[in-house]
Amino acid sequence: MAVRAQFENSNEVGVFSTLTNSYALVAVGASENFYSVFEAELQDVIPICRTTIAGTRIIGRLTAGNRKGLLVPTSTSDQELQHLRNSLPDDVRIQRIEERLSALGNVIVCNDHTALIHPDLERETEEIIADVLGVEVFRQTIADNVLVGSYMSLSNQGGLVHPKTSIQDQDELSSLLQVPLVAGSVNRGSNVIGGGMVVNDWMAVTGLDTTAPELSVIESVFRLGEGAAPGQINSSLKDTMVESFY
């Protein structure tokens, strides 16, 4: 399911929200309709936490996370950290990172298995990412841009990268990540993919300006049109498990 939304007249959905397979973060003060887009799809499935990070609402650019963990910058206040710990599932590890490049959402892109990071991140940061998120970490650029989190969106099913990414780069990244990649855009031609959308394994939210062709590319590369609601994934797995008992 891919849906379009706006955060207070902004199409940069990925700036004001973070979405994973086990939780969603939405900036506080979000106009109700923005929050309700997430609520409609996720309410009974995963917790949706309204929060600020370091007193700001650009939470999607300051945080990076997956099903297993959430990384926040060192400027995150104790109250915000406690609020996140109270709101997110107990098995999600939340870790503050002391890093010069503190807009973590711009410099890290990850799914539940792999992370691509800015080539200049500290070695210590790389180790924390691998440990907290439980992923394999690669230092990469996307179409010669070091801000991998800004120019790519990634789930366990696929990835969307900057429209000027060469075929050779796409193939290299695809083999690192072990998921299919497509070069494309969001919000009527914007190449800032990470800032313009959020995605998990069954849902994507993009800016209101995203065109129908862009939306169909998103639905196909992230395999969102395949009835992959979380409940259905579980039930199909359950069926195969039951069959294997006999």
From Swiss-Prot:
One of its GO terms (cellular component) is cytoplasm. Keywords: Cytoplasm, Initiation factor, Nucleus, Phosphoprotein, Protein biosynthesis, Ribosome biogenesis. Belongs to the eIF-6 family. CDD domains: IF6. One of its GO terms (molecular function) is ribosomal large subunit binding. It holds the Pfam family eIF-6. The keyword Acetylation does not apply. It is found in: Cytoplasm; Nucleus, Nucleolus. Phosphorylation at Ser-174 and Ser-175 promotes nuclear export. This is Eukaryotic translation initiation factor 6. It comes from Sordaria macrospora (strain ATCC MYA-333 / DSM 997 / K(L3346) / K-hell). Monomer. Associates with the 60S ribosomal subunit. It comes from the Eukaryota. GO terms for biological process: cytosolic ribosome assembly; ribosomal large subunit biogenesis; ribosomal subunit export from nucleus. The keyword Amino-acid biosynthesis does not apply. Its main location: cytoplasm. The modification Phosphoserine is found at residues 174-175.
